[in-house]
Amino acid sequence: MSSHRPELHITAQHGVLEAPAGALFTGEQWHVFHQYRSQPDVKKNNWGHVVSADTPFNWAHRDDVLSAEAPEVQVRAGSVVAPRCGDEAELFFTSVTDEGPSIHRALLTNLSGPQSDVRREGSVVDAPVLGLDKPQDFRSPCVVPGWADEDDRSEGHGGWLMLAVAGPMSAPELVMLSSHDQQSWTLDGPLAFHGDSGLAHHPILVSPRIIRLRDEVDGHVYDVLIVTVEADGVDLSGYLVGTLRGCDFWVKTPFTQMDFGHDFTRPRNTNTVRGVTYGNNERYDAALIFGLMNGVGRLDNPATHESLRAEGWANCLSLPRLTTLQGGLLFQTPTPGLTSAIPHTAHARMWSGLIDAQEGSVTVTLLDNATGRIAATITHSGHHLQLDRSMNPLHAEDSPAEAYLISADTDSLTIIVDGSTVEVFADGGVIAMASRVYFEGICGGFDVTAEGGASILRYFEVAGEDV
């Protein structure tokens, strides 16, 4: 019997998970909020809330924190921040009525308790609030409790910053807003790029996030802008590295694809409680990123998903990724604690190895225990990584996912299989791939081969209790 639902990844209990809405780590608990619909043919959606203690792998569902209230027709994704100590968080979300979207705020109290309380506090960003003559359709807020002292970026963070989307769906623009108290906001203007952004041929940018990381190579603190490009009905998520000053983003690294698998889009960073989650000297060392695994993005059709047909749910979030900045590039690896969590599952598996693939290739084959057939293959050939699921009858029309690797002293490969999800990290995390792979049963194991002069230097494997 198959079970497509993963055990370590976040899914909606039923219905369609549409987007990660916000994430918060308090130092003791992980809180992830997600936008979902209880049924695929229902327009109204909610903000779900899941919690995990210590590590982000053992999720418990809490009551929904937001649902559409008349005249709203939808509540969409935004940000969750905890600017101060205490058992509460601020929710910034997109409220949609028949007249269009605007950005609203709510206060969530009793955050760590079994049942949180939510108090809506109304619109904070819309045309009337900002004194504008006509609607601007503000949506998708990324809120940072403070941003930068430009004279000392390592200190930074005084006041509030909001990065949002405005304008029509066909021609959106990214805009910057600022506030001293998170309630009254000033529209500072559209975000402008200086230098080669790599986005000249991608006019539709959505789902923006901005974080700050210290580059491990030069020691400087940079701003990392994460965006999703909508092109021909398909999402492509990536990042730019540079320096944000007011509404101007000075580019160091142009738009770079963040994940090369079949099913990763609209990433969200995990916010923390300043001075509580991490010390001030650690706060720019790494970020924790979740992405949505749903195929093409906003225009994805959940009715085509085998998990919805067989089990009544569609889509999940990726595993959280520990994300660092090295030489202007993001490196993504599994969050610590995963190898300890997998043995407590029923069916999850992981294979991780150091390999030498400067000549030849190493291929890891995923086997379906119900049929004995190949469900997917992952091949590392030194400068090239491929995830191929086309031999699987449930993915027969799909082209392989491919990426080119930069030169590395040592090649490495980590593969996690959890239900119908497969996530791959290569060469220390310089390339990541997230793809759905459906099994008629479950993943029955890894068959690893080295060819053409390649070799496996060392490896380890962990698996759930029932495999």
Regions found by a protein language model. Give the residues of each.
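Beta-rich accessory regions
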Residues: 217-218, 231, 243-467
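Beta-rich carbohydrate-recognition and catalytic domains
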Residues: 1-139, 145-200, 214-260, 278-284, ...
